[in-house]
């Protein structure tokens, strides 16, 4: 199974790329974790945000291979503890489909992405910086995998 994080925005600081790479390389071959960056629409003083959001959503959905389970990252989504996320990861693996995790831009995700979503996941009720979210998702999923495989990374 493949886990892929589809994220709006492509000009991240080096520490973001390094942090994401550190966790993604730890996953085993049979559970790869990758990042696909979607360019953010140009925002300015008089930008049409709804049009930009729709275009970003269009690009996100076009990048996802058919048959993937779509999981959107949203404040209103389900909040999972590490054990619950581990169970969720296990269910995804049993399902056999690849998983596409979607993170929107500054204004969030387009309505089309939310509509296409099979599950909604909330990392926190807090508003988090998008660069940080990439690393948090990678670490959380790696930790969930370590729980499922009794790897010593996670300690109770």
Curated annotation (Swiss-Prot):
It is found in: Cytoplasm. One of its GO terms (molecular function) is rRNA (pseudouridine-N3-)-methyltransferase activity. S-adenosyl-L-methionine binds at residues 73, 104, 123-128. Keywords: Cytoplasm, Methyltransferase, rRNA processing, S-adenosyl-L-methionine, Transferase. GO terms for cellular component: cytoplasm. Its EC number is 2.1.1.177. Its main location: cytoplasm. It comes from the Bacteria. The keyword rRNA processing applies. CDD domains: RlmH-like. It catalyses: pseudouridine(1915) in 23S rRNA + S-adenosyl-L-methionine = N(3)-methylpseudouridine(1915) in 23S rRNA + S-adenosyl-L-homocysteine + H(+). Homodimer. Belongs to the RNA methyltransferase RlmH family. Specifically methylates the pseudouridine at position 1915 (m3Psi1915) in 23S rRNA. This is Ribosomal RNA large subunit methyltransferase H. The gene is rlmH.
